[in-house]
Structure formats: structure tokens, C-alpha cells
């Protein structure tokens, strides 16, 4: 027999049930709920709320974006409400952070490594920090940034992925601008970095990371070879997939690329890539972010350089969306970024 009780959260409901009610509320409304009472604010900041949202299948996928302007300011995009939320400024001492890695695990956004892209307006000199080992996490429940355990080494322009609740980084460049084959893995539960086997190959080009079929793939700019983490992190395998070069995005476990003014579905082996949609209208747009969310590909921000019709660089806050699962995929505009504009320095999905 269940006895009536008075809850400190919602009168007449056990706290366990009240937490489930709060977990079903979209994150968009949390700032208003924080104002209800101290007990609600404490409940909304609890790490248990993320676990409850996951357990009752009430998680949301939000798009996280950092653009060149304004400095070190992230925004979150809610696709269901077509709405942008501005986060508190990231408290890093590195000005105009760039060349970093970004990933999402445990309901938090992690910003890893990178260096300064600041240029002295008087002398034209670049800041001396090319790569760093610092790590920051953002908790959307407490709406606060926190400094986490530093990487084992400074790095920039490296591959970074979240996989099985952990973060893996590999390759990139040191602060001396020397390429590295070192790799490491981060556990958010213990706030600790541990080494992984070195990449089989180090290249003097930037690299990115993708998770495909449950494995991390490291791709180097300008090269067709891919390095794949095998055996639960025991070694790396080198494959030549012959993939087209260009911005890539994962949608429903399929890899898409923007190449030669077209969106194509990338395939391995001798299977030809599948044409999905024309994207020729974006050929004059550079420095944009491209990422998959749900059934769609998002193109965010970027710049349009000088040309016959304009004499200066135009920074964009535009968002363009393509549903690759529809019978006839067509581009549609999304709500533009409300604060950020220009080249996209970081782009990731946050599941909360």
C-alpha cells in the first residue's frame, strides 16, 4: 500500500515521481523552472536528472556551435523549437580559441586543447599559443563551465570523438607545430586521461575524427587513407577507402560529404557514391560547419569572401537544412544564429 506523502518538490507526489516529471520538461524551459524554488533549482542541477532523462527516453539532441565572432562564445540550437540559446562565455584565458576538439559525453559539452587565433591589431602578430592541453566542460543543467583534467600533452588540429561514454583524441600538432601520432582516452567519471597506442602514421596535415560502425576513424586532410581504432583500443588499422574530400557529416549511421557542389552518400570499396542533392549555392561559402542531426544535415555559419559583387568578407549567421531521408531532399532555411557569426571553429551534438 502506498502512503501519501508531502514532497519537497511537488505537493502530493513522491520526489522520485516529481524528478521524472521534471526530466520530461524540455531543456528550453529550465531557466524558468530554476526560479520556482531552491529545491527545484537543486533538483534541476542534479547529475541524476541526466540519468533519469536517459532512462525514461526523454533526452534531447542539441547543436553546439562556436563561431569566430564573438570570441569564445558558444550557442546551442534546439531543432524542435528552431531556437538558439547563448551560453556563458567560456572562461579560458586563451583568446579566440581555435584548432580545438569538441565532444559530448555524460550530458556535458567538452572543449579540448587548441590554441589562440588572436592577431594583434597593431602589429599583425599571432598569439604565441598554438596548442594547449586544457579541457573545459559545460553543464547545461547548472549552466556553468568547469576546468577538467588536462590532456597528457598539448595538441591542436587533432581528431576528437566520443565513443562508449568516453572521449578519444589522436594526432594533430604540438605547440611547436610538430605533428604527433600520440593518442589518449578520457573517462569523464574519473576525470582522467590515459594513453592509447600511437597512430600507425603521422602526417603534416590537420585530422578529424568520425565514429563509424562503432569505431573511431581518423581522417587526414588531403589523404585518402583512414586509420581505424581496433580491438577496444588495442591498435590502429590503416585502410584506403578512396573517399571524396570535403566536409562530412553522419546521419543515421551513414556518411555524407559535400564535394564539387553536391551532397553525396559516401560508400566504401567499389560501390559508387550516391548523389543526394545539389549544393551549388554554397560554393562561394567557406568556413561553415556541417553536421548531422536527426534525419538532416545542417550547414551553419561561414563567410563569403571578396568577389565581383562585394569587396569585403561577409560573416554569416545563416543556417541551411537538408533532410536526406525525404524522397526529394531540398534545402530549407533554419533560424540564423542569434549571436554567433563567421567561420565555425567548433560544432558538435549534445545529448541531454
For the regions a protein language model found, what residue spans apply to each?
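Kelch-like beta-propeller repeat domains
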Residues: 1-352
